[in-house]
Swiss-Prot record:
Residues that, per the record, bind heme b: 94
Organism: Orcinus orca (Killer whale)
Binding site for O2: 65
Gene name tied to this protein: MB
Modified residues (Phosphothreonine): 68
Catalytic activity: Fe(III)-heme b-[protein] + nitric oxide + H2O = Fe(II)-heme b-[protein] + nitrite + 2 H(+); H2O2 + AH2 = A + 2 H2O
Globin domain mapped to chain residues: 2-148
Summary of subunit composition and partner proteins: Monomeric.
Protein name from the UniProt record: Myoglobin
PROSITE patterns to which the protein is assigned, alphabetical: GLOBIN
Enzyme Commission number, as recorded: 1.7.-.-, 1.11.1.-
Modified-residue entries (Phosphoserine), positions: 4
GO biological process entries: removal of superoxide radicals
Similarity comment text for this entry: Belongs to the globin family.
Length: 154
């Protein structure tokens, strides 16, 4: 299920656009996640009080967390599938501390694709979307394997 060099290039090209505004992209992605799947908000004690999109847009904490999420994802994507060292601590915290189900990672992947397409339609056409979907699927498959090693079947 690996990506070709060309597919990785498509992923990293659009990621360059994301890195120009990690916090803004991250905030948009989290808002899309929470609006589309409100149950995911329950995993975030510090965001549970954010009930409206306006509240979410005004939250500096949400923006900071969006930056954190996309910084970690960017480090993983740049490894082009050789991301074991980056994945291990992420899987550890998400499985044992936060207890984030794999399904929620599917939800955020959908939000990532949507936000990147809406913000960068010229750079994120069908080929780039397909490549990013494959990269995110690889990430989810590998993190699910780490979850299993940790005894978490979320």
């Amino acid at each position: 299920m690996g990506l070709s060099d060309g597919e990785w290039q498509l992923v990293l090209n659009v990621w360059g656009k994301v890195e120009a505004d990690l916090a803004g992209h991250g905030q948009d992605i989290l808002i899309r996640l929470f609006k589309g799947h409100p149950e995911t908000l329950e995993k975030f004690d510090k965001f549970k009080h954010l009930k409206t999109e306006a509240d979410m847009k005004a939250s500096e904490d949400l923006k900071k967390h969006g930056n954190t999420v996309l910084t970690a994802l960017g480090a993983i994507l740049k490894k082009k599938g050789h991301h074991d060292a980056e994945l291990k601590p992420l899987a550890q915290s998400h499985a044992t501390k936060h207890k984030i189900p794999i399904k929620y990672l599917e939800f955020i992947s959908e939000a990532i694709i949507h936000v990147l397409h809406s913000r960068h339609p010229a750079e994120f056409g069908a080929d780039a979307q397909g490549a990013m979907n494959k990269a995110l699927e690889l990430f989810r498959k590998d993190i699910a394997a780490k979850y299993k090693e940790l005894g978490f079947h979320g």
